[in-house]
């Protein structure tokens, strides 16, 4: 029984020691003291109770202390609880301090909480970044299209990282400047001969205003000749004018056909009236003979004239060439 009691007691002691060292990061506390960072053991226990991993706070604090930065433990913990990346902020502060860039903890924390990569921003401040613009198409006044690409060298502006526009805005503004410069040129040859004209115009516009970057230089990487847009527009206009003229001609033809049909209908109507009038002639003659207004000799003289007229018409029709009506 005594042996079982000793075994049970040893198991309890081992369990207590295991729980003690798992809940209280003694190893981390020793590492901090060895690095010259004085952190009370109760502070580490309090972090556990606040569900803050002590390692995510202590290791960045050790790096900051070794780099000669004065960073307080409670501020690192507050930044972690706010959802920030403590390790990246400390790395950015160390990089800025070594590069001689003025960057406070509050500024770095604000940049990190704004969703920016503060460490990358410090690196871009030290080593400027080159942004390659996509192919930009623009048309000079002579109608020739030019295709240009540019390389924009930028440096991060730490003071404007919070609330400043990003790379997309820089690319869009540079593209706008390229289009404006090419569009204002009287000839595409002017741009081909002096591509630095685009760079000067873009830099003079102050395109980095309101952005998180400072434009150092704009270099035209390539300028190619595209389509003859002016000639293509003239061809399209001529084709459109041709179609309009054809439509108007078709309209006039349709109107002429309609007028011809109307005239034919009018002729037929006149012929009908003529036939109707001719049908009234015998009746009028009979009425004249009945009333004595026309004598018999006058009637026969009229018939002779009518026969003579019919004969002349027959002779004239016979004298016409074959095929002629």
UniProtKB/Swiss-Prot annotation:
The keyword Transmembrane applies. It is a multi-pass membrane protein. Disulfide bonds: none annotated. Its main location: membrane. Keywords: Cell membrane, Membrane, Transmembrane, Transmembrane helix. It holds the Pfam family FloA. The keyword NADP does not apply. InterPro entries: FloA. It is found in: Cell membrane; Membrane raft. One of its GO terms (cellular component) is membrane raft. It comes from the Bacteria. Found in functional membrane microdomains (FMM) that may be equivalent to eukaryotic membrane rafts. FMMs are highly dynamic and increase in number as cells age. Flotillins are thought to be important factors in membrane fluidity. Homooligomerizes. This is Flotillin-like protein FloA.
């Amino acid at each position: 029984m005594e042996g079982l009691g000793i075994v049970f007691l040893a198991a309890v002691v081992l369990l207590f020691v295991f729980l003690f060292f798992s809940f209280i990061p003694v190893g981390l506390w020793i590492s901090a003291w060895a690095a010259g960072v004085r952190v009370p053991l109760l502070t580490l226990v309090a972090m556990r109770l606040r569900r803050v991993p002590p390692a995510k706070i202590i290791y960045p604090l050790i790096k900051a202390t070794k780099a000669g930065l004065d960073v307080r433990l409670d501020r690192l913990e507050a930044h972690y609880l706010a959802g920030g990346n403590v390790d990246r902020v400390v790395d950015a502060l160390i990089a800025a301090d070594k590069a001689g860039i003025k960057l406070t903890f509050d500024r770095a924390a604000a940049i990190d909480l704004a969703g920016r990569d503060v460490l990358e921003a410090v690196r871009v401040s030290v080593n400027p970044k080159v942004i390659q613009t996509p192919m930009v198409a623009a048309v000079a006044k002579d109608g020739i299209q030019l295709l240009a690409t540019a390389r924009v060298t930028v440096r991060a502006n730490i003071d404007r990282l919070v609330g400043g526009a990003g790379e997309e805005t820089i690319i869009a503004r540079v593209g706008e400047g390229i289009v404006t410069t090419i569009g204002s040129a009287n000839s595409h040859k002017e741009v081909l001969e002096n591509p630095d004209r685009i760079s000067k115009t873009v830099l003079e516009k102050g395109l980095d205003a309101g952005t998180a970057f400072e434009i150092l230089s704009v270099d035209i990487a390539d300028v190619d000749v595209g389509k003859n847009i002016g000639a293509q527009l003239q061809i399209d206009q001529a084709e459109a004018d041709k179609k309009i003229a054809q439509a108007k001609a078709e309209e006039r033809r349709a109107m002429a056909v309609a007028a011809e049909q109307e005239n034919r209908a009018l002729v037929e109507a006149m012929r009908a009236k003529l036939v109707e009038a001719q049908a009234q002639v015998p009746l009028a003659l009979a009425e004249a003979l009945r009333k004595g207004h026309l004598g018999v000799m006058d009637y026969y003289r009229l018939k002779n004239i009518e026969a003579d007229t019919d004969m002349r018409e027959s002779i004239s029709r016979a004298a016409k060439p074959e095929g002629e009506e």
